[in-house]
Amino acid sequence: QDDVFKNYPDHKSLDNVLSSVYYNYYKDWSQDVIIDRGPALTEGNFKLLKQHLGQPVKCIVLWRDLLDVLASYIKWFENEPTAYPNQYNKKNIEEKLHLLMKDTGAIAKELKGIEHAMKPENKKHCFFIRYEDLVTQPEPTMKGIYEFLEMDYYPHRFHSLNQFNFNGLGHDDSDLGQN
């Protein structure tokens, strides 16, 4: 809470705004179910979702062996000069990994989210997927997701996928240094 809120702590109005954020963001989307890729499982975000979403929260948690995650990042920033860890004048792999693993780093934030998801009171809201299962057994993994979401499964195409594009917008990671 910042000083302005402390000067006029109007909780009801703030709750009204927070409760309308998700609805307003997706109001032009025709889909009944939307899977939003974001940091939902950090402790503060998860609390806000449960309090303001207006429906049960369901999170799909993709987890991967930490050494494999680190190896993937190393391969990325060693082969992509514009990768954001290369933009901080870090001299070696260890310094670049520290950037990712420090308390506010990308990997550390994800690990904290997974840790929070694994708490007994949160597990019922989460479906955990091992990265290796998604890659090697995509169909049974997807069927598990559909069951968790209480939706009817339909066959998917798992090869020769197109770049994600929706509502005329494509996913753009160029700010992270990817071409």
What are these regions, as identified by a protein language model?
Residues 17, 21, 110-113:
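Well-ordered alpha-helical segments embedded in enzymatic catalytic cores
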Residues 10, 20-32:
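Non-catalytic, charge-rich alpha-helical accessory subdomains
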Residues 1-19:
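PAPS-dependent sulfotransferase catalytic core
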Residues 28-158, 163, 168-178:
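PAPS-dependent sulfotransferase catalytic domain
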Residues 1-6, 152, 178-179:
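Short intrinsically disordered, low-complexity coil segments enriched in acidic
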Residues 6-7, 22, 35, 119:
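Polar low-complexity intrinsically disordered regions
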